[in-house]
Amino acid sequence: MYDLTGKHVCYVADCGGIALETSKVLMTKNIAKLAILQSVENPPAIAQLQSIKHSTQIFFWTFDVTMAREEMKKYFDEVMVQMDYIDVLINGATLCDERNIDATINTNLTGMMNTVATVLPYMDRKMGGSGGLIVNVTSVIGLDPSPVFCAYSASKFGVIGFTRSLADPLYFTQNGVAVMAVCCGPTKVFVDRELTAFLAYGQSFADRLRRAPCQSTAVCGQNIVNAIERSENGQIWIADKGGLESVALHWYWHMADQFVNYMQSTDDEDQEFFLGQR
Protein backbone atom coordinates (compact mmCIF):
# COMPACT_ATOMS: atom_id res chain seq x y z
CA MET A 1 0.00 0.00 0.00
CA TYR A 2 1.21 3.50 -0.86
CA ASP A 3 0.80 5.63 2.26
CA LEU A 4 -0.30 9.19 1.44
CA THR A 5 0.23 10.44 4.99
CA GLY A 6 2.49 13.48 5.00
CA LYS A 7 2.89 13.49 1.23
CA HIS A 8 3.26 16.56 -0.98
CA VAL A 9 0.79 16.21 -3.86
CA CYS A 10 0.65 18.30 -7.04
CA TYR A 11 -2.59 18.08 -9.05
CA VAL A 12 -2.65 19.53 -12.57
CA ALA A 13 -6.32 19.74 -13.61
CA ASP A 14 -9.35 21.98 -13.33
CA CYS A 15 -10.56 21.89 -9.73
CA GLY A 16 -14.03 20.75 -10.63
CA GLY A 17 -15.63 17.43 -11.41
CA ILE A 18 -13.31 14.46 -11.01
CA ALA A 19 -10.35 16.57 -9.87
CA LEU A 20 -12.37 18.20 -7.10
CA GLU A 21 -13.79 14.90 -5.87
CA THR A 22 -10.35 13.27 -5.98
CA SER A 23 -8.89 16.18 -4.04
CA LYS A 24 -11.59 15.85 -1.40
CA VAL A 25 -10.55 12.26 -0.80
CA LEU A 26 -6.87 13.21 -0.76
CA MET A 27 -7.62 15.74 1.98
CA THR A 28 -8.87 12.91 4.19
CA LYS A 29 -5.55 11.05 3.82
CA ASN A 30 -3.51 13.45 5.99
CA ILE A 31 -1.40 14.76 3.12
CA ALA A 32 0.87 17.62 4.17
CA LYS A 33 0.62 19.84 1.08
CA LEU A 34 -1.60 20.05 -1.99
CA ALA A 35 -0.69 22.19 -5.00
CA ILE A 36 -3.49 22.73 -7.51
CA LEU A 37 -2.67 24.06 -10.96
CA GLN A 38 -5.76 24.79 -13.05
CA SER A 39 -6.90 27.02 -15.88
CA VAL A 40 -9.43 29.11 -13.91
CA GLU A 41 -9.69 30.27 -10.34
CA ASN A 42 -12.22 28.45 -8.16
CA PRO A 43 -12.07 29.95 -4.63
CA PRO A 44 -15.21 28.11 -3.39
CA ALA A 45 -13.65 24.76 -4.31
CA ILE A 46 -10.38 25.64 -2.55
CA ALA A 47 -12.32 26.74 0.54
CA GLN A 48 -14.30 23.50 0.48
CA LEU A 49 -11.10 21.47 0.37
CA GLN A 50 -9.48 23.46 3.16
CA SER A 51 -12.51 22.89 5.39
CA ILE A 52 -11.91 19.13 5.19
CA LYS A 53 -8.41 19.32 6.69
CA HIS A 54 -7.24 22.66 8.08
CA SER A 55 -3.70 21.45 8.75
CA THR A 56 -3.04 20.57 5.09
CA GLN A 57 -1.46 23.47 3.21
CA ILE A 58 -3.16 24.20 -0.12
CA PHE A 59 -1.52 26.27 -2.83
CA PHE A 60 -3.08 27.42 -6.09
CA TRP A 61 -1.73 28.61 -9.43
CA THR A 62 -3.63 29.58 -12.57
CA PHE A 63 -2.07 27.30 -15.15
CA ASP A 64 -2.52 26.49 -18.84
CA VAL A 65 -1.41 22.93 -19.52
CA THR A 66 -0.92 23.75 -23.21
CA MET A 67 1.77 26.37 -22.58
CA ALA A 68 5.32 25.87 -23.80
CA ARG A 69 7.62 23.79 -21.63
CA GLU A 70 9.92 26.76 -21.03
CA GLU A 71 6.99 28.67 -19.51
CA MET A 72 5.96 25.63 -17.45
CA LYS A 73 9.45 25.57 -15.92
CA LYS A 74 8.90 29.07 -14.51
CA TYR A 75 5.64 27.97 -12.87
CA PHE A 76 7.11 24.87 -11.33
CA ASP A 77 10.10 26.78 -10.01
CA GLU A 78 7.53 28.79 -8.01
CA VAL A 79 5.65 25.63 -7.05
CA MET A 80 8.81 24.11 -5.60
CA VAL A 81 9.43 27.17 -3.43
CA GLN A 82 6.12 26.47 -1.66
CA MET A 83 6.10 22.67 -1.89
CA ASP A 84 9.82 21.96 -1.20
CA TYR A 85 9.40 18.68 -3.06
CA ILE A 86 6.73 16.67 -4.88
CA ASP A 87 5.89 13.11 -3.87
CA VAL A 88 2.88 12.62 -6.14
CA LEU A 89 2.12 14.33 -9.45
CA ILE A 90 -1.43 13.81 -10.74
CA ASN A 91 -2.17 14.76 -14.35
CA GLY A 92 -5.90 15.18 -14.80
CA ALA A 93 -6.42 17.93 -17.38
CA THR A 94 -8.82 16.70 -20.05
CA LEU A 95 -10.76 18.01 -23.04
CA CYS A 96 -13.20 16.27 -25.37
CA ASP A 97 -13.79 18.57 -28.34
CA GLU A 98 -13.92 16.63 -31.59
CA ARG A 99 -14.31 19.91 -33.48
CA ASN A 100 -10.92 21.09 -32.20
CA ILE A 101 -8.43 18.29 -32.67
CA ASP A 102 -5.39 20.40 -31.84
CA ALA A 103 -6.80 21.56 -28.50
CA THR A 104 -7.89 18.02 -27.61
CA ILE A 105 -4.45 16.53 -28.33
CA ASN A 106 -2.58 19.43 -26.72
CA THR A 107 -4.61 19.27 -23.52
CA ASN A 108 -4.87 15.51 -23.09
CA LEU A 109 -1.50 14.35 -24.39
CA THR A 110 1.09 16.98 -25.33
CA GLY A 111 0.39 19.11 -22.26
CA MET A 112 0.54 16.09 -19.98
CA MET A 113 3.87 14.95 -21.46
CA ASN A 114 5.34 18.45 -21.14
CA THR A 115 4.19 18.59 -17.52
CA VAL A 116 5.86 15.27 -16.74
CA ALA A 117 9.06 16.29 -18.54
CA THR A 118 9.10 19.52 -16.52
CA VAL A 119 8.41 17.97 -13.12
CA LEU A 120 10.51 14.79 -13.40
CA PRO A 121 13.86 16.50 -12.71
CA TYR A 122 12.51 17.73 -9.36
CA MET A 123 11.54 14.16 -8.43
CA ASP A 124 14.46 12.23 -9.94
CA ARG A 125 16.64 10.64 -7.24
CA LYS A 126 19.76 11.06 -9.33
CA MET A 127 19.04 14.78 -9.64
CA GLY A 128 18.51 15.40 -5.92
CA GLY A 129 14.84 14.41 -5.69
CA SER A 130 13.28 11.72 -3.54
CA GLY A 131 11.54 9.70 -6.24
CA GLY A 132 7.77 9.44 -6.06
CA LEU A 133 4.70 8.64 -8.12
CA ILE A 134 3.18 10.05 -11.31
CA VAL A 135 -0.52 9.36 -11.83
CA ASN A 136 -2.05 9.95 -15.26
CA VAL A 137 -5.84 10.14 -15.13
CA THR A 138 -7.19 9.00 -18.48
CA SER A 139 -10.16 7.16 -19.99
CA VAL A 140 -11.33 3.65 -20.81
CA ILE A 141 -11.40 4.73 -24.45
CA GLY A 142 -7.64 4.94 -24.18
CA LEU A 143 -7.78 1.15 -23.89
CA ASP A 144 -10.53 0.42 -26.41
CA PRO A 145 -11.47 2.54 -29.44
CA SER A 146 -14.42 4.89 -29.62
CA PRO A 147 -16.22 5.30 -32.97
CA VAL A 148 -17.77 8.51 -31.65
CA PHE A 149 -14.91 10.41 -29.96
CA CYS A 150 -12.05 9.54 -32.30
CA ALA A 151 -9.67 12.39 -31.47
CA TYR A 152 -10.33 12.08 -27.75
CA SER A 153 -9.74 8.33 -27.90
CA ALA A 154 -6.49 8.79 -29.83
CA SER A 155 -5.19 11.23 -27.22
CA LYS A 156 -6.05 8.83 -24.40
CA PHE A 157 -4.38 5.91 -26.20
CA GLY A 158 -1.32 8.16 -26.27
CA VAL A 159 -1.49 8.63 -22.50
CA ILE A 160 -1.43 4.86 -21.99
CA GLY A 161 1.52 4.45 -24.36
CA PHE A 162 3.42 7.24 -22.63
CA THR A 163 2.66 5.83 -19.17
CA ARG A 164 3.81 2.32 -20.04
CA SER A 165 6.94 3.57 -21.77
CA LEU A 166 7.97 5.85 -18.90
CA ALA A 167 7.33 3.10 -16.35
CA ASP A 168 9.95 0.86 -17.94
CA PRO A 169 12.62 -0.34 -15.46
CA LEU A 170 15.16 1.46 -17.67
CA TYR A 171 13.88 4.66 -16.04
CA PHE A 172 12.37 3.51 -12.75
CA THR A 173 15.54 1.84 -11.49
CA GLN A 174 17.40 5.08 -12.11
CA ASN A 175 15.03 7.87 -11.06
CA GLY A 176 12.85 6.10 -8.48
CA VAL A 177 9.68 7.61 -9.97
CA ALA A 178 6.84 5.13 -10.49
CA VAL A 179 4.28 5.87 -13.21
CA MET A 180 0.71 4.59 -13.36
CA ALA A 181 -2.60 5.44 -15.03
CA VAL A 182 -6.25 5.33 -14.03
CA CYS A 183 -8.77 4.91 -16.86
CA CYS A 184 -12.13 6.36 -15.87
CA GLY A 185 -15.34 4.90 -17.30
CA PRO A 186 -18.36 7.06 -18.21
CA THR A 187 -18.73 9.57 -15.39
CA LYS A 188 -21.53 12.02 -14.72
CA VAL A 189 -19.44 15.18 -15.08
CA PHE A 190 -18.43 14.01 -18.59
CA VAL A 191 -21.72 12.77 -20.00
CA ASP A 192 -23.60 15.84 -18.72
CA ARG A 193 -21.76 18.00 -21.25
CA GLU A 194 -22.85 18.74 -24.79
CA LEU A 195 -20.85 16.20 -26.78
CA THR A 196 -20.05 16.31 -30.48
CA ALA A 197 -19.00 13.25 -32.48
CA PHE A 198 -15.92 13.29 -34.71
CA LEU A 199 -18.13 12.59 -37.74
CA ALA A 200 -21.82 13.42 -38.12
CA TYR A 201 -22.63 9.72 -38.48
CA GLY A 202 -21.85 9.26 -34.79
CA GLN A 203 -23.81 12.21 -33.40
CA SER A 204 -26.89 10.17 -32.49
CA PHE A 205 -24.65 7.97 -30.34
CA ALA A 206 -23.08 11.02 -28.69
CA ASP A 207 -26.54 12.37 -27.86
CA ARG A 208 -27.61 9.01 -26.48
CA LEU A 209 -24.59 8.90 -24.17
CA ARG A 210 -26.03 11.78 -22.16
CA ARG A 211 -28.87 9.49 -21.09
CA ALA A 212 -26.71 6.44 -20.47
CA PRO A 213 -26.06 5.12 -16.94
CA CYS A 214 -22.76 6.25 -15.52
CA GLN A 215 -20.82 6.36 -12.28
CA SER A 216 -20.97 9.33 -9.96
CA THR A 217 -18.06 11.75 -10.00
CA ALA A 218 -17.52 11.26 -6.26
CA VAL A 219 -17.18 7.48 -6.61
CA CYS A 220 -14.73 7.92 -9.48
CA GLY A 221 -12.63 10.29 -7.38
CA GLN A 222 -12.61 7.82 -4.49
CA ASN A 223 -11.41 5.03 -6.76
CA ILE A 224 -8.62 7.15 -8.22
CA VAL A 225 -7.26 7.54 -4.69
CA ASN A 226 -7.82 3.84 -4.04
CA ALA A 227 -5.73 3.09 -7.12
CA ILE A 228 -2.96 5.40 -5.91
CA GLU A 229 -2.86 3.62 -2.56
CA ARG A 230 -2.64 0.25 -4.32
CA SER A 231 -0.23 1.45 -6.98
CA GLU A 232 2.69 -0.39 -8.51
CA ASN A 233 4.99 0.97 -11.17
CA GLY A 234 3.49 0.58 -14.65
CA GLN A 235 0.07 -0.42 -13.41
CA ILE A 236 -3.04 0.58 -15.35
CA TRP A 237 -6.39 0.68 -13.55
CA ILE A 238 -10.00 0.93 -14.71
CA ALA A 239 -12.29 2.96 -12.47
CA ASP A 240 -15.79 2.23 -13.73
CA LYS A 241 -19.28 1.40 -12.43
CA GLY A 242 -18.18 2.16 -8.90
CA GLY A 243 -15.40 -0.44 -8.99
CA LEU A 244 -11.66 -0.64 -9.53
CA GLU A 245 -9.98 -3.23 -11.74
CA SER A 246 -6.33 -3.76 -12.66
CA VAL A 247 -5.67 -4.11 -16.40
CA ALA A 248 -3.77 -7.18 -17.63
CA LEU A 249 -1.14 -5.72 -19.93
CA HIS A 250 0.07 -7.53 -23.06
CA TRP A 251 2.90 -7.28 -25.54
CA TYR A 252 1.51 -7.61 -29.07
CA TRP A 253 4.77 -7.33 -30.98
CA HIS A 254 6.36 -10.79 -30.91
CA MET A 255 9.90 -9.34 -30.84
CA ALA A 256 9.28 -6.93 -27.95
CA ASP A 257 11.20 -8.82 -25.27
CA GLN A 258 14.12 -9.55 -27.58
CA PHE A 259 14.22 -5.92 -28.68
CA VAL A 260 14.41 -4.65 -25.10
CA ASN A 261 17.16 -7.16 -24.31
CA TYR A 262 19.03 -6.07 -27.42
CA MET A 263 18.81 -2.39 -26.48
CA GLN A 264 19.98 -3.02 -22.91
CA SER A 265 22.63 -5.65 -23.60
CA THR A 266 26.34 -5.11 -24.07
CA ASP A 267 26.80 -8.78 -24.95
CA ASP A 268 27.62 -9.36 -28.62
CA GLU A 269 25.93 -12.77 -28.57
CA ASP A 270 22.61 -11.27 -27.35
CA GLN A 271 22.75 -8.65 -30.07
CA GLU A 272 23.54 -11.22 -32.73
CA PHE A 273 20.61 -13.36 -31.54
CA PHE A 274 18.16 -10.48 -31.96
CA LEU A 275 19.48 -9.52 -35.36
CA GLY A 276 19.34 -13.15 -36.45
CA GLN A 277 15.68 -13.46 -35.40
CA ARG A 278 14.70 -10.63 -37.71
UniProtKB/Swiss-Prot annotation:
**SUPFAM superfamilies in the cross-refs:** NAD(P)-binding Rossmann-fold domains (SSF51735)
What CDD domains would the database entry show? ADH_SDR_c_like
The question of whether Transferase is a record keyword is answered with no
> Which GO molecular function entries does the Swiss-Prot or TrEMBL record give?
oxidoreductase activity
- Identify the residues that bind substrate: S139
- Look up the domain of life of the source: Eukaryota
Q: Where is the active site?
A: Y152
Instruction: Please state what the protein is called.
Output: Alcohol dehydrogenase-related 31 kDa protein
Question: To which species is this protein native?
Answer: Drosophila pseudoobscura pseudoobscura (Fruit fly)
Q: What is the lineage of its organism?
A: Eukaryota, Metazoa, Ecdysozoa, Arthropoda, Hexapoda
Question: Gene name on record?
Answer: Adhr
